[in-house]
A protein has these predicted regions:
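Short, acidic, small-residue-rich periplasmic hinge/interaction motif at the N-terminus
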Residues: 29-33, 41-45, 74-78, 90-139, ...
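C-terminal beta-signal and adjacent terminal beta-strands/loops
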Residues: 836-843, 866-928
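Extracytoplasmic beta-strand/coil segments of soluble accessory domains associated
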Residues: 147-187, 228-229
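Gram-negative outer-membrane beta-barrel transporters
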Residues: 719-722, 741-844
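Transmembrane beta-barrel wall of Gram-negative outer-membrane proteins
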Residues: 291-400, 644-646
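Surface-exposed extracellular loop regions of Gram-negative outer-membrane beta-barrel proteins
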Residues: 187, 533, 560-576, 619, ...
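Outer-membrane beta-barrel signature, preferentially recognizing the C-terminal barrel domain
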Residues: 415-439, 581-594, 666-723, 733-760, ...
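Short acidic/polar hinge/loop motifs at secondary-structure boundaries
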Residues: 61-63, 186-215, 235, 260-262
């Protein structure tokens, strides 16, 4: 009874105490900017035990015994404030920085440069429609390169490599060819051997101050971005001395269950025999017998990433510098199931027929090196000059090992009879980009005119030397595999490729501001000149098995275990000793762009009107290094475009905008598309098109924007693009022949909706975006039809028709959801991010209604950080679900049900399934 009575008294006392506790709520903001501050210490003046910390949105809650109560507000870089609270809710407390310039506030402040608040502010005040990812958001995300970062932006889908790495970006359902990439506002060249798009995985994410994606172009921007423009703004010199280092190690789960295959990297010949000697040199077997094809199998070393930066301002803060270094060495790969297919011709059903299955393992060791440095010198209050240099280097050593089963000839699984093929590819890819940019900023005529200029030199390089593939075959009878022998025709191919893309460019802008009644008028004009020179080299040798010591009739029959044990022991003869330097991939290309613009920006109390016109002249040409009879061996295209734009931003109130935009933009043919090449295949000849026209598009946008708090946003918008002369690959009939060639196909339409939401609570935050995209384009295709001529021995004939479909590379539905948790007291940051990509048109087929689709999938990534004094421990993981990426036809053929183990996929025909493993990195960061 006493125990019960005591428990009752304690319980009653607690209830009474709680009932007499008052919970006060408030928000801490910066006096100068009005920005909410997170991590501010709040306590009662007479009882320091009663304390709390403001959350991500600057809010706080605190239990006190009575009102009024005096609070003490402490925050690094700010004056300590005593504040008396008289009410429970809606307490807005303003604190003032201890220094006049908020840029001097130390890193502990939420006003740190390159954070989400700055990113939202840029989006809010931008002249056109854009999305920004800040350096702070990148740092806390699970991403290590720019390609992975950009997938978090609405309207962006990614094209991935065989090892699962994101590489190219598609903006608003427009293929990668329809956007361009900038570094600090300067377009950079491409290392691709045929096209002008940039592989974004070559850029380490830790070098960025922010990533900008502009979706509607203004007149002062280059005009060839129908999808948009990607701008990587690199880190500036800090206002105070700073040093940071970040290192991590990790592993890919793929190699827990299997070995990593590698080869002797030093054995790769960077030059072909043609280049090493002369064009008259006949290559010999000894020129290829260098041990490259000897395979080593083991467990890979852990991944190793490191990046560091150092910067300061010296000479009375006039000279600023920032030097950054990033290096990543990782082991990636893929386990891929691939089904070969053809089109059913015997019954003219045009349904897909599965002809074989191959199991491929990819083993990739890749390294990324990034070095960048930036100097800026403040000559005076009116003059400043900057010099930026960057060198980016990417290397990938890959073995692709394939085992294939033929379903079309000799396939009898019930008796254990079928034919087997083996293929192993040894490939080294090396790409680098160098950029050097000088920028000047000046105020003229008593600061009435702003003048800036830019001079830039950039060079991109790509090489794939001694790309070697070895092919062998065998048979299985009664479930027992017979001896493996080298393929007689095409036993080994060895290929050398390299290309350079070199740019010299300059641009300038004059901006004058005129004060009006209750507003201002900004008038800008400028120009651009770029000279691009591109060189391309390709050479391939065909090696065939031959052992002169064997008996007549057996010299080409080289058997594994008898004549050789590993690939390096196979004896070959060179079938084409002079290589294939006559290949159309040997060409030079040039492009000269001259542009000028006039732009006005009217700013009144509640609206901003940006109008302008840009004129761009293009002179694009090519020169075949090996002349071909009957074609244009030298050609050029010269044209001028007038590109108007108008962007209206109506300010509904301080935190709400309504935007309406129109712009005209273009897309130029890629370098190789206008070269008159011909590549003969079994059924079709691929052909270049010197008469290919450039694409012109009219782009319309409407977006409604709300910025409830400085780091929060709600954006919803629609877009529409009317695309004239879109470039797609299709069938063109010439006489009795059909050619697969890049062609202009009339008019295409592309439209969609984008939604972006960012919301922060006390310790939590949510970022969500969704994009719906649809399009329509009609292109020519071929199909088989039963022959109605009774006198003909041909059962079916090939016809040309047309198909209306969406644009290549487009997914109708995209979504991103990121959940953010921040424990301010214990300095812990956690993120889990999901990316959903709906069914995407992956590749366009020559055949009617037989395009390849990528199935919808979800990728899940996560990151966790814990700060300990000046160091931060972190873990980042990608592809946590090890989500398979599958390709398929939407058609299904019951004939395929006779194949042992083959199943339907999404009521269609499975073509490929990729598994790339889970990547996990553990590391630490240190900043001073």
């Amino acid at each position: 009874m006493k125990r019960f009575f005591l428990t009752f008294i304690i319980f009653f006392s607690l209830v009474y105490a709680y009932a007499n506790t008052i919970v006060i709520q408030g928000e801490i903001i910066d006096k100068k900017s009005g920005i909410p501050l997170s991590g501010v210490n709040v306590s009662t003046s007479n009882n320091k035990a009663q304390k709390t910390i403001t959350g991500l949105n600057g809010s706080f809650t605190l239990k006190v015994e009575s009102l009024p109560v005096e609070l003490t507000i402490n925050y690094v870089g700010y004056k300590t404030l005593k504040y008396i609270v008289n009410k429970q809710n809606n307490n807005t407390i303003v604190i003032e920085a201890t220094v006049e310039d908020l840029k001097e506030v130390q890193v502990n402040s939420s006003l740190e440069k390159n954070n989400d608040i700055l990113a939202r502010n840029i989006e809010k005040n931008a002249a056109s429609i854009s999305n920004i990812v800040s350096a702070k958001a990148i740092e806390l995300s699970p991403d290590f390169n720019v390609a992975n970062v950009i997938q978090r932006i609405s309207g962006v889908t990614l094209e991935r490599t065989s090892n699962g790495d994101a590489q190219y970006a598609t903006l608003r359902g427009m293929d990668k060819r329809y956007n361009y990439t900038l570094v600090n506002g300067i377009k950079i060249p491409s290392p691709d051997n045929k096209n002008r798009f940039i592989p974004l995985d070559i850029f380490p994410s830790d070098m960025l101050a922010r990533l900008e994606v502009t979706k509607s172009l203004t007149a002062d921007m280059e005009g060839d971005g129908i999808g948009g423009a990607i701008n990587m703004v690199m880190k500036d010199a800090p206002s105070v001395k700073s040093f940071s280092i970040n290192t991590s190690t990790g592993y890919n789960s793929l190699y827990i269950d299997r070995q990593f295959l590698s080869y002797n990297k030093d054995a790769v010949n960077l030059k072909s025999p043609f280049e090493s000697y002369s064009n008259l040199y006949a290559a010999k077997p000894r020129d290829f017998a260098n041990g490259l094809t000897k395979i080593t199998s083991n467990k890979p070393a852990p991944n190793f990433f490191i990046n560091s930066s150092f910067g300061n301002r010296i000479f009375r803060k006039k000279l600023g510098y920032m030097v950054g270094l990033s290096y990543q060495n990782s082991f990636r790969g893929g386990d891929i199931t691939n089904y070969g297919s053809s089109i059913s011709t015997s019954d003219a059903s045009n349904l897909p027929v599965v002809t074989g299955k191959s199991d491929r393992t990819f083993s990739d060791q890749q390294s990324r090196l990034g070095v960048h440095g930036k100097l800026d010198y403040i000559i005076s209050e009116k003059n400043k000059i900057q010099w930026y240099n960057a060198y980016l280097d990417f290397k990938n050593h890959q073995i692709r090992d394939t085992r294939g089963v033929d379903y079309s000839i000799g396939y009898d699984p019930s008796n254990g009879n079928y034919n087997v093929s083996y293929s192993t590819r040894f490939r080294y890819t090396h790409q680098n980009i160098y950029n050097s940019t000088v920028i000047g900023d000046h105020l003229l005529m008593n600061s009435k005119i702003k003048f800036d200029w830019t001079l830039a030199y950039s060079k991109a390089f790509n090489e794939i030397p001694e790309n070697t593939t070895v092919n062998t075959v065998s048979t299985v009878r009664n479930n027992i595999e017979n001896q493996v022998s080298v393929v007689t025709l095409g036993g080994q191919s060895v290929r050398w490729e390299h290309n350079t893309d070199e740019d010299v460019s300059g641009k300038f802008n004059f901006i004058s501001t005129v004060n009006l009644n209750k507003g201002t008028l900004e008038i800008a004009t400028g120009g651009l000149y770029r000279d691009k020179q591109r060189a391309n080299f390709f050479n391939e040798y065909d090696l065939r098995p031959f052992d002169d010591n064997k008996a007549v009739g057996q010299k080409n029959n080289l058997i594994k275990g008898v004549d050789w044990k590993d690939y390096s022991e196979i004896k070959f003869t060179v079938y084409n000793p002079y290589g294939s330097t006559g290949d159309p991939l040997n060409y030079n290309a040039s492009e000269i762009i001259t542009a000028g613009y006039l732009q006005t920006k009217l700013l009144k109390e509640n609206f901003q009107l940006n109008t302008g016109v840009r004129v761009e002249n293009t002179n694009q040409g090519y020169n075949l290094l090996n002349p071909v009879a009957g074609v244009k061996n030298i050609g050029e295209q010269v044209y001028t475009d007038v590109l108007p734009s108008i962007h209206l931003k109506y300010l509904l109130n301080e935190n709400k905008n309504l935007r309406v935009s129109y712009s005209r933009s273009i897309n130029r043919p890629s370098f190789f598309e206008i070269v008159p090449y011909k590549i003969i295949n079994e059924e079709f000849t691929e052909m270049g098109n010197p008469d290919l026209k450039h694409t012109v598009a009219d782009n319309f946008d409407i977006r409604y924007e709300i910025f409830p708090k400085p780091a929060e946003q709600f954006l919803i918008g629609i877009f529409y693009k009317n695309i004239n002369n879109p470039i797609e690959t299709g069938i063109v009939d010439q006489g009795q022949r059909s050619f697969f060639t890049p062609t202009n196909f009339g008019i295409a339409k592309n439209y969609g909706l984008e939604l972006d939401i960012t919301k922060y609570f006390f310790n939590f935050g949510i970022k969500f975006n969704y994009t719906y995209t649809n399009s329509s384009i009609t292109t020519s295709k071929v199909y088989y039809e039963l022959n109605t001529d009774p006198n003909s021995s041909v059962r079916n004939v090939l016809k040309t028709g047309s198909q209306t479909r969406q644009l290549n590379g487009q997914a109708a539905n995209l979504a991103n959801l990121t959940f953010i948790y921040k424990n301010i007291k214990n300095i812990i940051d956690f993120q889990i991010a999901a990316v959903y990509t709906g069914d995407k048109l992956f590749a366009v087929s020559r055949f009617l209604n037989n395009d390849t689709w990528q199935s919808s999938f979800v990728q899940l990534d996560a990151s966790l950080e814990k700060k300990v004094k000046k160091a931060t421990l972190f873990i980042k993981s990608n592809n946590l679900l090890n989500t398979p990426v599958s390709l398929y036809f939407k058609k299904y053929n019951k004939v395929n049900e006779t194949i042992s183990g083959y199943e339907k996929f999404n009521n269609g025909t499975l073509l490929r399934k990729d598994l790339n493993g889970i990547n996990i990195q553990l590391g630490f960061k240190f900043k001073i």
